[in-house]
Amino acid sequence: MTQQTFLVEIGTEELPPKALRSLAESFAANFTAELDNANLSHGEVSWYAAPRRLAVKVANLSAAQADREVEKRGPAIAQAFDAEGKPSKAAEGWARGCGITVDQAERLVTDKGEWLLYRAHVKGQPAQLLLAGMVNTALSKLPIPKLMRWGDKETQFVRPVHTVTLLLGTEVIPGTVLGINSDRVIRGHRFMGEAEFTIDSADQYPQILLERGKVIADYELRKSIIKRDAEQAAQQIGGVADLSESLLEEVASLVEWPVVLTAKFEEKFLAVPAEALVYTMKGDQKYFPVYDTAGHLMPHFIFVANIESKDPQQIISGNEKVVRPRLADAEFFFKTDRKKRLEDNLPRLETVLFQQQLGTLRDKTDRIQALAGWVAAQIGADVNHATRAGLLSKCDLMTNMVFEFTDTQGVMGMHYARHDGEAEDVAVALNEQYQPRFAGDDLPSNPVACALAIADKMDTLAGIFGIGQHPKGDKDPFALRRAALGVLRIIVEKNLSLDLQTLTEEAVRLYGSKLTNAKVVDDVIEFMLGRFRAWYQDEGHSVDTIQAVLARRPTKPADFDARVKAVTYFRTLDAAAALAAANKRVSNILAKSTDTLNDHVHASILKEPAELKLATHLVVLRDQLEPVFAAGQYKEALVELAALRETVDEFFESVMVMAEDDAVRVNRLTLLSKLRELFLQVADISLLQ
């Protein structure tokens, strides 16, 4: 069957840069799924994305679906005809659905009976008839939170669409996509190359766009060019460019023909904290800052133009003029803010609402101050420094710098606290209170910072859950999922001895009578345990391992971590599967039993050698493991418990648990409950699959 290259390009106005990659990848994935669902064989599927286009190219696409044989079994003959041999309604309905009459149906005869049968040879449809519809379906499934209309059209898309190119080999596939009839016309760069030209063959893409349109459609190529040229530009001035992945992606999504240039700013601005300068360079202007080999910010920046200019110095000068007022603003704010102490901003926090039912930022500050001190006492941090950090924690939100450059919250608090002569761990805590901000982010570096970060996040969790505003679906306006995971990461990775039960109770207590949810403590803990599940799945632990530990509801995060790792190791042992099955059997036996168990096993009632052996083994292990459990050495405990495999197997092979004699039966059930209790001190391994 003939195979050809297929190309679809959607020409648009400027697409959202932060969404460009996801749009392109989703388009390719959706279209591939459509091809596979339609049984159209194909080779490699490539995606292309630039500010004004999304494209997918498919190699070796079959010209038509393969023919296929269809079989549909109908009602059994007994139900297909009545006593007089007339077709039943069920048979007629089935036949109608197949496009035949009952008389035209074949018979399927097996050892189990006889049925009506429809067989047909279905000829595959040409790809030309299917592709436009498949493109429309793939586009309709893109992750676009907000669609827009343009002109007088009813069509909706992320941005207005101007061209649609659908080519199978050299032929245009007729069809309408997003209100535009397909053609072979594509658009080039706005200011370079040909504004508009025709493409003869799908195989010419994306090379023809590069040569005639001056557009690099290959997203990864464009990104790699920017990275390479920016690194070289930084080296030429003796520095290292800050090529953060997120900004690199965004800049690659803003330009069609990247040209990397280097500019500078006045050295006097380096007196301003680097974070503020970097914020305006990266956040506002999409520039790459440059650092020297010691990690200090240099008075240079690298930017990417979207055009090859005959006079690049003009572009450089223009960008230097644009950034100077922003840096001057930062300098002014920094000087102005330092004219008063950070603590002097406390009264102004009363004018800012944290949440209508939960009070102002000043109220939140008081709670954080108290909770940070409480946490510090639990983890051995300096209580006075923790409460001081709590008091100052939100003061920088009232400064000019943070008001103008919002992403500098925390870090400016640190700089202003240092200027005021605060203790260093207090100053650092003000910066690190929001950590970790995202998956993989650094954790607070000192105990005071840990106490403040935990207090800030727990106050938010307790408050928002306390008024019943739980996260729903993908809506989480107070970032409670991030806060919960942040608390858990700090406690686990810093190995802090904190219990979620008492921690949550203290956070709730500090709200007084403001909270309306009577189950707030349980709700917060369950929510946080749910975050544990997601976190440990991402770490590679199996779902049933996590469920086995969650069944014990351990509220100490560090303890939870030790249990999960212990069970994961236990599963590698030869005895694991047999003991998990035995625990499941014991669990089922105990669940079905209506007998009241004894407090302990009565040795005098034990008769069978296998039950005597198990009882003795359990007594020995219980005494050995008591200090092991107390120390939280769960891995070592499970290794010891694995030695029970042979004894447990012998018990089930030779002992009738549900004996007729009541005393014997209850004693054996009690023995099994003691076996299960030992394992339950780590996890419910009966849940392991």
Curated annotation (Swiss-Prot):
EC number: 6.1.1.14
Source domain of life: Bacteria
Entry's Gene Ontology molecular function annotations: arginine-tRNA ligase activity; ATP binding; glycine-tRNA ligase activity
Cellular component terms (Gene Ontology): cytosol
UniProt-annotated location(s): Cytoplasm
SUPFAM superfamilies per record: HD-domain/PDEase-like
Gene name for this UniProt entry: glyS
Keywords from the UniProt entry: Aminoacyl-tRNA synthetase, ATP-binding, Cytoplasm, Ligase, Nucleotide-binding, Protein biosynthesis
Originating organism: Yersinia pestis
GO aspect biological process, one term: arginyl-tRNA aminoacylation
The protein's name in its UniProt record: Glycine--tRNA ligase beta subunit
Reaction(s) catalysed by this chain's protein: tRNA(Gly) + glycine + ATP = glycyl-tRNA(Gly) + AMP + diphosphate
Family, as annotated: Belongs to the class-II aminoacyl-tRNA synthetase family.
Subunit (UniProt): Tetramer of two alpha and two beta subunits.
A matching Pfam family: DALR_1
Location, primary (coarse class): cytoplasm
